[in-house]
Amino acid sequence: AWKGMKSITITEVEYVAYRLAKEHMLWDEPIPDFSSRFPNALESCLATPFQAFGGKKLYKGLIEKAAILFYLMVKNHPFKNGNKRIAMVTLFYFLSKNKKWMEVDNQELYNFAKWVASSNPKLREDTVSAIKNFLKVYIKDL
């Protein structure tokens, strides 16, 4: 297995993903100021994919990590608005940092993000599994 997987920092979300979402995905609603985000929610979203328990990684491989990252960015609402859009750009950024990309239409990905957002939290594992399958369909090497 490839050992050099790169995580994302809060600063990268602020300066890359958040800014890109704000510039290119305003659509109907504005995205509020980065400083208005909820304390610790974003930190948790970014840390969870890399957590271990009893010496074992909870999420193995890039697809699993990307899937839980996207799920948490959408479902945990780290921002007051724009969570789905910021989640999309964060996903692209995480993949590109790890030499991957998704060849998917923005609207299709946004529709999928809306589906994830409306999913039943009790079905978290099934939803994350669906995200993994979605990623497998569209992921490409950079």
Protein language model features and the residues they cover:
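FIC/Doc superfamily catalytic core
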Residues: 1-142
